Curated annotation (Swiss-Prot):
Binding site for S-adenosyl-L-methionine: 30, 72, 123, 194
Assembly behavior: Monomer and homodimer.
Protein name: GTP 3',8-cyclase
Organism field: Escherichia coli O139:H28 (strain E24377A / ETEC)
One GO biological process term: Mo-molybdopterin cofactor biosynthetic process
Length: 329
């Protein structure tokens, strides 16, 4: 289906990132170093399964092909499997993925796959168990590794792993990561540390450009692959000697926003046109009944006309994003 979601800069949007909670049980240094603190949840709480069904149906009608369930930690929701199944009901949604810290993967991933999940991203910022504990505040490294193995055993052909690139923390561990993916079909995605409202000091201390890794990968014979229209923002590299791939997400690179293809809805039903944008468009009042779908689609389409050409991270403007758990990164 051709996307009806096209902005003023001719960008087409096939990809919805849907946050279903902002609660997380990890305390990652770059996201929630002091742990989760409730904020911004209305009296209605987080989106219900029925509301999720309605909002994804509207986006699918407008051309969305891929939905990623994010958080917080999505698997903290007891109805998470039901949420996957609700999104899966719509045949227009070809891909349903989750971004998770992985602590419930080993237990639940087979059920998620049976419900309709097609893709998994797991956050792993270090392959050293002690450093993993220091970064996340949780001694769960072995549990997360077992969860990744369980995903393969459940039938997932590829698992994506997200690694936030941090100077003097993990930027010098490329060889360790490459050894890990040599015989595993893992797409390891290094994500540049992004400045958020609460993370300015950490950013100044640990930010390093992904260009450093890209230059090294090219020097070693890795090959840049072409993007598909519903792919995320990663530049993906492959190598004939490796079963795995490397992805680089570099939001500070020139023209990063030119290929933007994704919109975000928060766990309380606000449409966000950019991770680092201002405000948000309330959709929740149009999620109460199936008869509101036409009005919901109209509001989404109208909001898209206001999407800016680029973020303003280079001007140190992080918008409303105080931390990355707020609207799902």
């Amino acid at each position: 289906m051709a996307s009806q979601l096209t902005d003023a800069f001719a960008r087409k949007f096939y990809y919805l990132r849907l946050s279903i909670t902002d609660v997380c049980n990890f305390r990652c240094t770059y996201c929630l170093p002091d742990g989760y603190k409730p904020s911004g949840v209305t009296n209605k709480g987080f989106l219900t399964v029925d509301e999720i069904r309605r909002v994804t149906r509207a986006f699918a009608s407008l051309g969305t092909e891929k939905v990623r369930l994010t958080g917080g930690e999505p698997s903290l929701r007891r109805d998470f499997t039901d949420i996957i199944a609700a999104v899966r009901e719509n045949d227009a949604i070809r891909q349903i993925a989750v971004t998770t810290n992985g602590y419930r993967l080993e237990r639940d991933v087979a059920n998620w796959r049976d419900a309709g999940l097609t893709g998994i991203n797991v956050s792993v910022d270090s392959l050293d168990a002690r450093q993993f504990h220091a970064i996340t505040g949780q001694d769960k490294f072995n549990q997360v590794m077992a969860g990744i193995d369980a995903a393969f055993e459940a039938g997932f052909e590829k698992v994506k792993v997200n690694t936030v690139l941090m100077r003097d923390v993990n930027h010098h561990q490329l060889d360790t990561f490459l050894n890990w993916i040599q015989h595993r079909p893992i797409q390891l995605r290094f994500i540049e540390l992004m400045e958020t409202g609460e993370g300015s000091e950490l950013f100044r201390k640990h930010h390093i450009s992904g260009q450093v890794l890209r230059d090294e990968l090219l020097r070693r014979g890795w090959i840049h692959q072409l993007r598909q229209r519903s792919d995320g923002p990663a530049q993906v590299f492959c190598h004939p000697d490796y079963a795995g791939e490397i992805g680089l997400i570099m939001p500070y690179e020139k023209d990063f926003c030119a290929t933007c293809n994704r919109l975000r809805v928060s766990s309380i039903g606000k449409l966000h046109l950019c991770l680092f944008g201002e405000g948000g468009v309330n959709l929740r009042d149009l999620l109460e009944d199936d008869t509101q779908q036409q009005a919901l689609e109209a509001r989404i389409s109208a909001a898209l006309r206001e999407k800016k050409q680029t973020h303003f991270l280079h001007q140190n403007n992080t918008g409303i994003t105080q931390n990355l758990s707020y609207i799902g990164g």
